[in-house]
UniProtKB/Swiss-Prot annotation:
The keyword Transport does not apply. Binds 2 divalent ions per subunit. Binds 1 potassium ion per subunit. SUPFAM superfamilies: S-adenosylmethionine synthetase. GO terms for cellular component: cytoplasm. L-methionine binds at E58, Q102, D241, K272. The gene is metK. This is S-adenosylmethionine synthase. It comes from Maricaulis maris (strain MCS10). It comes from the Bacteria.
Length: 388
């Protein structure tokens, strides 16, 4: 039996966190290639450490892209995040590029040819989730955790809070009653900052940000409001900790409130079902909840490398559904082509829309006119209602 009253926590990390720097660089490279060739293949991994950026992976592109373009794109990503520190500077960090041509053995399984449809880029399982507890149809703890850090970054970049530096983390613990968010029991924020500031200084700079983000009356007790609990946080970013692409997969998704198939998103073109199928599952789950067929919805799909059709589709409405789950599965199969090509076509994923996803969550965002966050549209809700 599921519990209706409990306490749950999610965390987020800022765009300047070392792993997120790597995600941003990797997705910037994906965008660079897709901007030249919508059918480009990219698997770009990034490592960062003190004044070092290392790119590695496999690519294929119909248009020429030279090393200078790749390096310029990576440096611009770091510049936009805001790193101009002695230990990590967008302009002076050493960049090593080990990207090379995609394996023909992988390509032969993925590419369409003759009567063979485009296959999945790998085997695996992917999940999507939605909940009606926030307007974004996302879990509340991860939503507020993202919003705190996004607001801090906006203040830093605008010059309103120059005391903040790019590297930061947040964590929000919420109390649920009858399965509904009822308050915040604690908030943790750790942020890199300019030298010469005390812990109390940073605490009072962070306080209004948290107050603005949380609903009125939800600010935690003073003793449960933690800011830079270890004290000074001047050395940070890749200079403080090495970063790698794909290490913040729970931050990227649902903050631990839903299962994760294990595959990271950043650095991958949309033929990789780790990314595209997870986006499709979120799209389907969000439309189920938007159609008011359930308060919560988890969807799982699975694939085999080189095979176009998904091997399975599973729906769990967590006891909140107004429809039979097996019938809902049939309706989703009828309405959505979940082959890799079907997903890319329906969600228009062959576009340079990925750098913007690299921080503050891939889900719960606002769709844009250029096709960004297309998986957040609720354009399937009416059709689902009519079928069920």
């Amino acid at each position: 039996m599921s519990r209706s009253s409990y306490i749950f926590t999610s965390e987020s990390v800022s765009e300047g966190h070392p792993d997120k720097v790597c995600d941003r660089i990797s997705d910037t490279i994906v965008d660079l290639f897709l901007g030249k060739d919508p059918e480009a293949r990219v698997a770009c991994e990034t490592l960062t450490t003190t004044n070092q950026i290392v790119l590695a992976g496999e690519v294929r592109c119909a248009a020429p892209i030279d090393d200078a373009e790749i390096e310029a794109a990576a440096r611009e990503a770091v510049r936009d995040i805001g790193y101009e520190q002695d230990g990590f500077h967008w302009e002076t960090a050493t960049l090593q590029n080990f990207l090379h041509e995609q394996s023909v053995h992988i390509a032969q399984g993925v590419d369409a040819s003759g009567d063979k449809d485009e296959g999945a880029g790998d085997q695996g399982i992917m999940f999507g989730y939605a909940s009606d507890e926030t307007p974004q149809l996302m879990p509340a703890p991860i939503t507020y955790s993202h919003q705190i850090l996004k607001r801090m970054a906006e203040l830093r970049k605008s010059g309103a809070r120059p005391e903040f530096e790019p590297d930061a983390k947040s964590q929000v613990t919420m109390r649920y009653e009858n399965g509904v968010p009822a308050g915040v029991t604690s908030v943790v924020v750790s942020t890199q900052h300019k030298d010469g500031l005390t812990q109390d200084d940073i605490r009072e700079l962070v306080r209004p940000v948290v107050q603005d983000v949380l609903p009125e009356g939800w600010f935690p007790p003073e003793e449960e409001f933690y800011v830079n609990p270890t004290g000074t946080f001047v050395i940070g970013g890749p200079d403080g900790d090495a970063g790698l692409t794909g290490r913040k997969i729970i931050v990227d998704t649902y903050g631990g409130a839903a299962p994760h198939g294990g595959g990271a998103f950043s650095g991958k073109d949309p033929t990789k079902v780790d990314r595209s199928a997870a986006y499709a599952c979120r799209w389907l789950a969000k439309n189920v909840v938007a159609a008011e067929l359930a308060k919560r919805c988890t969807i799982q799909v699975s694939y085999a490398i080189g095979v176009s059709k998904p091997l399975s589709l599973y729906v769990d409405l967590h006891g909140t559904g107004r429809v039979d789950e097996a019938k809902l599965e049939d309706a989703l199969r009828q309405l959505a082509d979940l082959s890799p090509r079907g997903i890319r076509t329906r969600l228009q994923l062959n576009k340079p829309i990925y750098a913007r996803t690299a921080a503050y969550g891939h889900f719960g965002r606002t769709p844009t006119e250029d096709g960004g966050f297309s998986w957040e549209r609720t354009d399937l809700a009416d059709e689902l209602r009519s079928l069920l």
